Structures are given as C-alpha cells and as structure tokens.
C-alpha cells in the first residue's frame, strides 16, 4: 500500500451557539481536511482546526506545512514503513502540531484499513463506548446557569465550565451553575490560563468553601508558568489538570516529574497526533497520572481519532470530546457515532470514515 497523493481541502461547520472562553469567541469550526490516497484505492482521512491562540496554527500554516514539508516526505512510500512514516511527519518541520496530527491520524486510518482492523483494536482497546462531558461557555452567571440546565436536560451528567474572563465573577458563575444543576452533576472548570498562581488558589479555595464541589481545574495559570502550576497544585483544595502546558511527551514528563499538576490533558492537535499521544499515555502509566482526552473546536474526523485512543487506553479516565455535538451539522459519512454524551467507536477498518457529504469540502486541487 503506497501513498500516491496527499489531497487537501477545507470545510466549515457552524456551531449551535457561539463558543466563548477566556481566550476567544468562535462561531464556526474551520477545519483543514487531509486525504492520503494509495495505490490500492484505500484513503486515510485526517483533519485539523487552526487554533492560533493555543497552537499558533493558522489555516494557511497548516496547509503550507503539509504541502511543502510533510507531503514530500510521504509520497511514494509504502505503509509497511509505518514507524518511519510517522517519524517523517514529526521530523518534517518543527512545531506545526495540528498539521502533523492531521497527517498522523490519516496514517493510522490507513494502517487499520491495511490490516482490516479498527484503529482502537490495533491500539489494544476493548471498549467501544465512552461518555463525554459538554462545555459551558463563559458568559454572565444567569446565562451559564440556563445553558447548564439545558445540557442536563439533554442527558449530560458532567459539565466543563469555562471561567476566567473576569476572575472576580468566576465564583458567582460557578455558584449559579451549581445551583441550576444540583449536587449530582459533576463540574470541572477550565480557566484557559487566565489567572496567576495566588489568584487561582484564592478563587479555587473560595469555590470549595462555598461547597461548589469542583472535580478539577484545567490550566489555571499561563502555560509556561510551571512554578505557578506547582504552587496551585500544592495549595489549592482542587486537583489541577495541565492542558496548554503539555504539548509534547517531554512536556508531559516534565509535568509529572515536577509534580506541577495532578492530571494531564492529551490533545492530538497539541502533541502532533496519535503516535505522540501514545507516548504521553505511556509516561502517564509509568507515573500513575490519570489523563483526560480533549479536543479543540474540531469536527468529527479529528475527534474520531481521539475516540480511537480513548477506547484503547485505560489511563485515559476523563473524556472531553464534545466538538461534534457542539456543531450544528455533521458533514462526515461513517466513523464513530456521537449521540449527545454517548460516543460509540466504529468497528469498521481504520476509523470507519467513508467520505463526506457531497459538496461540503472545498478541495485545493
């Protein structure tokens, strides 16, 4: 099975409602599509969103990285060189993790098709069903309470609540959400780097003193402030999950070795795909650090790849893969089924992707 063409396109998917965090407001998912075509007729699919405020990637950067650097390293090569192919993706250029992730997942999709096995089985997985949380955007407290009630009515029993735009309002925001949903719903919060270390400890301890019962806080301080992360981890009465602080396997090791967080968030767009995500999961298994699998604002294909990993690794105990259910449309044929909080991975070879609704992808060729 030789790679004969790397085809690129763009796809736009409106969100049900605007997505608001401490970093940005987004109205639609804008993804780059990757198709790896082979001499057998098999096609491997990948996808990447430009998330400039986190990964630094833009649509043009993703397309350029793949066209000018990654594709030339793959064309004409056989999938039997799989380890060399995934290494070539990572070595083609520095950074550009979203572009690398899109191509890496497409290679895994092809590998599954080559051996007539779903990706999650090839990774050693046995479970087909996982349950995700859903994100509540940061807004005025009463609006967040309303959104939280709606999510619970849709069947969600775990909410990821965005905070951080105005730290002085964050306690009121979470209090409104907790009052709206009751005590049986899990609440995890994400500050998206918005606080400093002392501010984070003060706010988190206030939340706990009010009995708001937070499962964990995600990335309370700036990504580069590992000392600040350590301070929050040691002094706040809430477990800390490292997100933007962890891009590479080396980053994950540093977090685990220094005790800068209690948990680690794996995102394919940060680490460069399934291959590096497996390395992060392996390190977490050694250190006994539980992981969450998360996503950017992504549509179905790239989140599908994360689902394959989540179904394979028991160290991934927390699921934050709500991207497809935040979208108002599904342009992808086949693959995992996203039924509100319930996600079922496909048992078809590879990722089970069969293509796109006609006319939805704007190809570059």
Give the positions of each predicted feature.
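Flexible C-terminal active-site loop/helix
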Residues: 4-15, 29-31, 296-365
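Conserved, mostly hydrophobic/aromatic
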Residues: 3, 34, 41, 70, ...
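Active-site beta->alpha loop and helix N-cap motifs at the rims of alpha/beta catalytic domains
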Residues: 136-144, 167, 171
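Catalytic core of soluble alpha/beta enzymes
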Residues: 161, 167-302, 329-331, 336-338
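Glycine-rich phosphate/pyrophosphate-binding beta-alpha loops
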Residues: 48-56, 135-139, 295
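N-terminal small/glycine-rich loop or linker at the start of catalytic domains
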Residues: 113-137
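Metal- or metallocofactor-binding catalytic centers and their adjacent structured scaffolds
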Residues: 5-7, 37-114
